[in-house]
Amino acid sequence: MRQFIPMRRVLAVATLGALFWAAPASWAAAPPEAASCIACHGAGGMGNPAAGYPRLAGLPEQYLADQLRYFADGARNNAVMSGMAKPLSAAQVTALATYYSKLKPSGKPAPMPTGAAAAEGERLALRGDWEKGIPACIRCHGPGAVGVGENFPALVGQSAAYIEAQIKAWKDGSRSGDPLGLMHTVALRMTDAQTQAVAQWLAAQPLSPTKSASAKH
């Protein structure tokens, strides 16, 4: 007698197979816990821009470990990530952070915005708005916004949706853990229009800094 296999199971197996073949060569070295990360953050750790899931690949190891701890203890308020992070042991947190920090980021930036919003985004990222006490993004996140040290991660390679959501989270207090409360203070001074403009401009920048994206006018 021929056994009937539910279509749901067939689709599940096909999906897992596709994820396996899409995984980078380094996936063989991934800790077991990373299997739970791939659905949202992708096989290469570059996230899902359409859904607002962030890039993890190439971010500092200590930064990644800190974020998992913040999700676990509530410093970052996200129901899904809190549920993922709370059961992790210290060794598992370290293993995940180490693995994703060693992945090489890849991919193309989002399309460059146009018009007044693009000009405003560039101004905020490269020069800031000192009349409102808003420093340029590159002051802390480095030339090209590629990140500096363990506390100031790369902004390039992240989607506009994610960057905008995080600025709003700093603003409303649902995210904390920033050095000296710096991001909370900056976010409070930004309008929604400024938040959207700088997020869209940063998302359109290349992973490697260019002269225009690194200039401190």
UniProtKB/Swiss-Prot annotation:
Role summary: Acts as an electron acceptor for the thiosulfate dehydrogenase TsdA.
Record's protein name: Thiosulfate dehydrogenase electron acceptor
Domain Cytochrome c as annotated: residue spans: 29-104, 116-206
PTM: Binds 2 heme c groups covalently per subunit.
A Pfam match: Cytochrome_CBB3
PANTHER family xrefs: BLL4483 PROTEIN, CBB3-TYPE CYTOCHROME C OXIDASE SUBUNIT FIXP
Keyword vocabulary terms for this entry: Heme, Iron, Metal-binding, Repeat, Signal
Molecular-function annotations in GO: electron transfer activity; heme binding; iron ion binding
Keyword Repeat set for record: yes
Record: residues binding heme c 2: 137, 140-141
Residues making up the signal peptide according to the UniProt record: 1-28
Residues given in the record as heme c 1 binding sites: 37, 40-41
GO CC annotations, alphabetized: periplasmic space
UniProt keyword RNA-binding present: no
